[in-house]
Amino acid sequence: MKFGYFCNTTNWDHKPYDQLLNETKEITTFCDENNWDSIWYTEHHFNHEGMESCTNPLMMGVDAAARTKKIRIGQACNVITFHNPIRLAEDIALLDQLSGGRVDVGIGRGIYGREAINMNKEADLKDQAKNFRLFDETLTILKSLEKKFFE
């Protein structure tokens, strides 16, 4: 059995963001030093209520790679409908190199309408079929980038 920590950076108390990030860094270091198998960061935007305050799980992963030695680093998840697939693949590959191959990739379509409409109008969750087509197209591109050539 393997154990991972889902680092959901909630901020119900409305702490200063730097304090929230420092606490997240401490949790990351603790998990690595205490032999957890993985740590997972979220991607959420525009959450003024204080929940899920991490906007970029890949950037959190870069910090984790620099401060840890063995823990695997995951994203729960990269909302791929918000991103250019080629740029996202490059960022994931760079994190994997910087971490010494410790990256686990998690992907999703998004859950909050205000995120989708502001990050990519094409990902509007009011049209689930359109959102899913965008997800499928982006996933196809991401998978094809594992190869040397793609169409």
What are the residue ranges of the model-derived segments?
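Hydrophobic residues within beta-strands of alpha/beta enzymes
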Residues: I39, I73, V103-V105
